[in-house]
């Protein structure tokens, strides 16, 4: 697959629209092509992460209302499916309306919107989580700013499964070979010919070179978050 896009000249809105178009087109085949989050794999690690969040919330939560969780850029709804066991209020946020339609999660609120412009009031959520979210955004910092705005005092933002730039630099030859064998982009395009390779590449904005963990942590701190843990 070609990867010749001058991403430096791409506007944030172009990246958002590419995500919207591409995932609207492949929504029906998404889970068939990318089976990494299927029930055939043990995902109990997510429950441990959520339990750690709950322990943190117990010591910081203000008020007695029902705990609320937002799955930001929810995709297949993988994170929300695990979180619903622990959180009475679940919100799914995704820029693709068709992806949201594919998620079977009764009583969850579905919101079709850009994760960098979240239509929610201040102090609305206890936890905002994103699995493989940040690399789809041209500016993860804008998502962090929105998250800070809508999280309640003592709330938590959790992100995971975005490739780190130092990892890419350290293992570039091995990663190149792995991607040759297991690149989901080719499979998406083969299963959905009407989808666009350009949209796919734009949607994976930071997917090729990764994101800097220290830089993301610095941005979070500048916004006002306290960093509990950085693992990569």
What are these regions (language model features)?
Residues 2-63, 99, 156-188:
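Conserved class I S-adenosyl-L-methionine
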Residues 199-215:
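Acceptor-substrate binding/catalytic loop of class I
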Residues 70-117:
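Class I SAM-dependent methyltransferase SAM/SAH-binding core
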Residues 132-133:
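Short catalytic micro-motifs in class I SAM-dependent methyltransferases
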Residues 225-232:
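Conserved S-adenosyl-L-methionine
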Residues 141-153:
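A short glycine-rich, Lys/Arg-flanked "PGG" loop and its adjoining helix->strand segment in the class I
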Residues 129:
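A conserved beta-strand element that flanks and buttresses the S-adenosyl-L-methionine
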